[in-house]
Curated annotation (Swiss-Prot):
It comes from Clostridium botulinum (strain Okra / Type B1). Keywords: ATP-binding, Magnesium, Manganese, Metal-binding, Nucleotide-binding, Nucleotidyltransferase, Transferase. Belongs to the SELO family. InterPro entries: SelO (IPR003846). It comes from the Bacteria. This is Protein nucleotidyltransferase YdiU. The keyword Phosphoprotein does not apply.
Length: 491
């Protein structure tokens, strides 16, 4: 590889423990050079939490690092190999346009992957150019930071730089690179890859590495690989419940887009639901609704079953016993997911204690919302402040009956109405990344070079539970002509 390392005090404290794995898992690869990198956006709060130096990152040398033209002295740039089931079909994949610089160790001792996305061709590019366009990279920046503010586990976005290149898609677009920060980039697809093309020793090496990196607090007397599977199932049950509670539609829940760490990753065709409809799909390529909003829990269980299949040789020496162990573990997902979802929905309705009838109360509300085309986020916002008359549900007989039952339910708990309202305020965001507002910000930035619209949007999204007057603009619904929102997998 070409040597381009430089000593720059960015605050990056890099290791690359992933390279301790067998070489089947990665290829050493420098990012492609770009002609004229310029900083588009820098995440100052994230810089602070990671212990980095914002001033240096904004310098010429710092921007060169974010663009891949230079690499920190301690970096070992690699692209990672993985496979995946895409829309149910297995295929070989890998980092086709991303380079992992290494793992940054924060002053607090936390470990985070630092990855450049859109950094050029790799051995896994499969004929692609390895580049990324500015619009999709800014979009991932906005959505991932909004998800973090909403309290949903997610990869983060440290920076976006423009490259000075034009890249060809349907039209000519401005090139860009996003610096992604993640607990790790180990995916279900990473295990699928080594299960298909590696040895059992290499599979065990990956499993042991994953346990050490993400699940250190294990009881070594138990089967560590069953523990690994169970912990991933728990994390995904929590994550998917949080998606559903907030109305988030990932759009491309392939197994390569399910992380072992439990973070949301890859914001290609994702979007947030406006009108409540379980069949909501935004992705232009999901023509059969495989990854529709209401199907996300089922797909998560399916993906986890694929992970369990890869671990069978490690779960038990007897294949039949291994299958039983895996099936028992996977069967827990539905219960774990439902418990997380019900707990979250109770919070959205100001309910502290549990009653068996709660699920019916919740499902009845969702059914009424679906029937009348109620906005998901704004309905719960209206319930929080008892101003439902401002929504399409105002005056509807079914809703009035439901409302009475809900009020009766609230009287059957010790907590006060004020406490219930506080719980609802902390459970129901006043603002989400509305699709039309995100597009408005992207259009200003990409077409006009005006980042002020995006900055204002990011500021509003950084305080989703604030209920401030300034957020009203970002809570308004799209015009009917823009309701048929469709996304494309640009990220």
């Amino acid at each position: 590889m070409e040597e381009r390392k430089v000593i720059i005090k960015t605050g990056l404290n890099l290791e690359n423990s992933y390279t301790s794995l067998p070489e089947i898992f990665f290829t050493r690869q420098n990012p492609n050079r770009v002609p004229s990198p310029k900083l588009a956006v820098l995440n100052y709060p994230l810089i602070t939490s990671l212990g980095l130096n914002a001033q240096v990152l904004q310098s010429t040398d710092g921007v060169d690092i974010l663009a891949g033209n230079k690499t920190p002295e301690e970096a070992i740039p690699i692209s990672q190999a993985y496979a995946g089931h895409q829309f149910g079909h297995f295929t070989m994949l890998g980092d086709g346009r991303a380079i992992l610089l290494g793992e940054h160790i924060t002053p607090q001792g936390e470990r985070f992957d630092i990855q450049l996305k859109g950094s050029g061709k790799t051995p896994y590019s499969r004929g692609g150019d390895g580049k990324a366009a500015l619009g999709p990279m800014l979009r991932e920046y906005i959505i991932s930071e909004a998800m973090n503010a909403l309290g949903i586990p997610t990869t983060r976005s440290l920076a976006v730089v423009t490259t000075g290149e034009s890249i060809m898609r349907e039209t000519e677009l401005s090139g860009a690179i996003l610096t992604r920060v993640a607990a790790s980039h180990i995916r279900v697809g990473t295990f699928e890859y080594v299960s298909r093309w590696g040895t059992i020793q290499e599979l065990r090496a990956l499993a042991d590495y994953t346990l050490q990196r993400h699940f250190k607090k294990r009881n070594d007397k138990d089967n560590p690989y069953l523990f690994l599977l169970q912990e991933v199932i728990k994390k995904q049950a929590e994550l998917i419940a949080k998606w559903q509670l907030i109305g988030f539609v990932h759009g491309v829940m392939n197994t390569d887009n399910m992380t072992i760490s439990g973070e949301t990753i890859d914001y290609g065709p994702c979007a947030f639901m406006d009108v409540y409809d379980p069949k909501t799909v935004f992705s232009s390529i999901d023509i059969y609704g495989r990854y529709a909003y209401g199907n996300q829990p089922n797909i998560a269980a399916w993906n986890l079953a694929r992970l369990a299949e890869t671990l069978l040789p490690l779960l038990h020496i007897n294949p039949n016993e291994a299958i039983k162990i895996a099936e028992n573990a996977i069967s827990d997902f539905t219960k774990l997911y439902k418990n997380n979802w019900l707990s979250g929905m109770r919070g959205k309705l100001g309910i502290f204690n549990e009653e068996l009838e709660d699920e019916y109360l919740i499902e009845d509300l969702l059914s009424i919302m679906h029937k009348y085309g109620a906005d998901y986020t704004n309905t719960f916002r209206a319930l929080t402040f008892d101003n439902i008359e401002d929504t399409v549900l105002g005056g509807k007989v079914e809703f009035d009956k439901w409302y009475k039952l809900w009020q009766e339910r609230l009287t059957r708990q010790e907590e006060s109405k004020l406490s219930s309202r506080q719980l609802m305020k902390s459970s129901n965001p006043s603002v989400i990344p509305r699709n039309h507002r995100v597009e408005e910000a992207l259009e200003a930035a990409v077409k006009e070079g005006d980042y002020s619209v995006m900055e204002k949007l990011l500021d509003a999204l950084s305080k989703p539970y604030a209920y401030s007057k300034e957020q009203d603009y970002y809570s308004t619904l799209p015009e009917p002509s823009t309701c048929s929102y469709q996304t494309y997998c640009g990220t």
